[in-house]
């Protein structure tokens, strides 16, 4: 009896899956219109839809949301620029903070790996605090552009003395790409995105503290010598995040219009990607609308 059940069920299952695969996907019949071509800043632009599609994705044409850059991951001729704020206080020890870059650090957080890597000291490219919060200024890292990633590190040195070892705070860290034409595109948009890891080479009681707003370290008087590193994740200096669209429709129900407000004047190429699809097939149409914001 069990054999007969299997013989009946298996053909039925085979039929089900073959039928599912044969379901034909049609191209979306989808169009977009606007009431006018020119709008004011902060005025809602209403896009009216006709036809239908399973999914619709919206690219508003602003920086970071351009359809033509949806697969872009690098930029030729870009200038990588590093910035951060520092605050060094308490204690009179000098030369306690260094800014370094490595092309060959293997990412292993131990003394041997850190020391085996070649670290280039670029501290002299930055303005460091002498007691109050100061900006590093814009640090050009163009000379480190190459195939493969780099790591950026802060190295802290404190000596066992009768005066406190200096306390350092690093905030507002960012690494951006200045693209041809002047657009600024993020590589590491903020300190929390740096993928920081720390390692104490000497003076294990003290180490870099990693928080979302800052990196900080310090020690009291008469404490053992300290050498502590905090290092970013691997960074590609010419890399950029692909531009992203906004999903405004899925299978949950129909959408007949969509409104968007622009904060800056300019001419925008707005793109809607309409898709019909399932796990076996996918068809799409792309609709463009030009709008001017004044």
What are these regions (language model features)?
Residues 15-18:
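C-terminal motif of bacterial Sec signal peptides marking the signal peptidase cleavage site
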Residues 159-161, 275-281:
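Short, solvent-exposed loop/turn segments at the edges of extracellular beta-sandwich modules
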Residues 247-254:
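Short beta-strand segments within Ig-like beta-sandwich modules, predominantly Fibronectin type-III
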Residues 256-264:
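Residue-level recognition of secondary-structure-to-loop junctions
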Residues 161-202:
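Exposed low-complexity, polar/acidic, P/S/T/G-rich flexible segments that act as propeptides
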Residues 114-144:
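Extracellular carbohydrate recognition and processing domains
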Residues 20-95, 105-108, 265-267, 281, ...:
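Acidic/polar, low-complexity intrinsically disordered N-terminal segments immediately downstream
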Residues 80-88, 97, 101, 147-158, ...:
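Extracellular beta-strand-rich recognition modules
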């Amino acid at each position: 009896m069990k054999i007969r059940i299997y013989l009946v069920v298996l053909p039925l299952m085979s039929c089900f899956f073959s039928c599912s695969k044969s379901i034909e996907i049609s191209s979306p019949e989808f169009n977009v219109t606007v009431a006018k071509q020119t709008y004011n800043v902060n005025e809602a632009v209403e896009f009216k839809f006709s036809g239908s599609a399973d999914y619709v994705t919206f690219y508003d044409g602003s920086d970071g949301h351009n359809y033509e850059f949806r697969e872009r991951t690098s930029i030729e001729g870009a200038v990588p620029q590093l910035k951060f704020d520092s605050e060094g206080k308490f204690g009179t020890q000098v030369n306690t903070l260094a800014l370094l870059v490595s092309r060959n650090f293997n990412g292993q957080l131990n003394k041997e790996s850190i020391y085996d890597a070649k670290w280039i000291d670029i501290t002299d490219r930055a303005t460091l605090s002498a007691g109050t919060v100061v900006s590093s200024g814009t640090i050009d890292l163009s000379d480190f552009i190459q195939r493969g990633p780099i790591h950026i590190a802060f190295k802290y040195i404190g000596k066992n003395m009768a005066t406190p070892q200096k306390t350092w705070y690093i905030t507002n860290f960012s690494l951006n790409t200045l693209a041809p034409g002047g657009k600024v595109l993020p590589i590491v948009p903020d300190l929390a995105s740096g993928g920081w890891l720390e390692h104490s080479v000497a003076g294990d009681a003290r180490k870099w503290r990693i928080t979302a707003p800052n990196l900080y370290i310090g020690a009291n008087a008469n404490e053992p010598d300290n050498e502590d590193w905090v290092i970013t994740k691997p960074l590609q200096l010419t890399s950029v995040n692909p531009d992203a669209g906004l999903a405004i429709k899925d299978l949950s129900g129909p959408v007949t219009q969509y409104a968007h407000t622009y904060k800056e004047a300019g001419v925008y190429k707005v793109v809607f990607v309409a898709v019909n699809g399932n796990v076996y097939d996918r068809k799409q149409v792309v609709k463009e609308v030009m709008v001017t914001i004044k």
